[in-house]
């Protein structure tokens, strides 16, 4: 039987600092650090905040005031999600990303009129496709 993972960082009073994230992410913590470097290299700002509607801490990643990526912590990995209007989906599939990533994006259900591109960051290998999709998001209007 399949076990469904649940989002971590649900305690409003516990800020997701380095020690908290190391505990939640475990071996994937180094990939998270690589992810932060990727954001820094692309002049993106990131900030953890508790969202009452979702009852969890989320990290919003922005270029100037535009949200590019949303991150959430799960047991053993960081999830990074980039939302696109439907009109960009065909262009995403033209990017040089792996077929596995394209398959995941294609199978993910839309949220309203947006398509979430979800990446499970368990190791640094996952950062390549994320970076390509993220840079495409930065270029779109």
Identify what each model region corresponds to.
Residues 1-141:
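Charge-dense, helix-prone N-terminal extensions
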């Amino acid at each position: 039987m399949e076990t469904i993972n649940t989002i971590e960082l649900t305690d409003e009073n516990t800020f997701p600092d380095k020690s908290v994230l190391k505990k939640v992410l475990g071996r994937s913590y180094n990939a998270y650090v690589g992810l932060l470097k990727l954001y820094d290299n692309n002049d993106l700002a990131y900030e953890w905040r508790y969202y009452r509607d979702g009852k969890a801490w989320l990290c919003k990643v922005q270029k100037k005031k535009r949200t590019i990526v949303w991150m959430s912590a799960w047991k053993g990995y960081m999830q990074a999600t980039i939302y696109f209007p439907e009109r960009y989906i065909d262009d995403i599939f033209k990017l040089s990303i792996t077929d596995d990533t394209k398959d995941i994006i294609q199978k993910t259900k839309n949220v309203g009129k947006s398509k979430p591109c979800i990446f499970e960051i368990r190791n640094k290998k996952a950062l390549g496709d994320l970076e390509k999709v993220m840079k495409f998001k930065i270029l779109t209007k």
